[in-house]
Amino acid sequence: MRRILFNSSNTVVLAHRGLWGKYAGIPDMPENSRGSLQIANDQCMDGVELDVKLTSDGVPVLLHDYNLGRTTTVWQQHPGVKYDPLTNQGVNPSILVTPWSQVSQLFLLTPDRRTTTGYHVPRVDELFTYYKQRQLRTPMVFDIKDAKTVRAVNSAANKVFGAASASYVAAKVNATLYTSRSAYQADGDGMVGIPVFTTNMLGKINVRQTIGAWLSTGEAMEINVKQLGGQLQSDADFVRERDVRVGVFQAIPDGPRASEFYKNNGECCYKLSDLFYGKDTADNRGSLDYIERVEAFGLITTDDPKTAIAYLRARGKHD
């Protein structure tokens, strides 16, 4: 975990949603599955970033969307038909109103959604137990959107890993949720917090002040500068000048059509231009050349980590 958190001459790469699908060389491997964590470990990824949501009864599970239709067999539990992201029709209940007793019965779909896999939606506590029993080594970073989920994942990590939690588990959290490291630590005392800054936060918080309130430990931050000289550029430079690792999300489309991304309810789709805020006029984060050569980000979260690592190695930026 220290390799992820602290700055060095090497750039570190996180496998987004684990190592899954075509990026793993296993087309049927589902995202955010126990298998995607195992494969990332087996293929020696620097780390993984996994998404967490809470069931209606407070069980933290791996899931990217707030709804179950895109990635699971939830239509088999309800009257209706399999969810179609293109039409936004079919069975697609929210995870927030679905108890673990129902979620536990669901299977994950293959990335192309054509076939059911043998993988269930993973509980985070059971994933930690699996990790420990199998003696996995790949650090786990969790993308967490609310304080209740931070507390739930932190509790699960402490129960399985104890005082060593911070060696295995970290949480990415929006800087609007926790505007200081001390505020985060009140909920996430066992796992390191990585604050995430995006341009749409500029109208909600004082970004530079918030960065200052997270700087004390010198641990990594994600600052999503979309274009050279764009919004957040001076903030990313401010952090780099203090020898703190600055991360970015590589925006690789995951939708069924070119340049499109699934929405967080599973519906298709949006384009990066739909998320422009204020003075944004471009989003170049899909380009490794922009990420490494232009902006020199030190931490990359990407669906295609093997390509990123090969790119970095060719430039002497990865072991």
Where are these regions (language model features)?
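Phosphate-group recognition and catalysis centered on beta-loop-alpha active-site segments
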Residues: 1-319
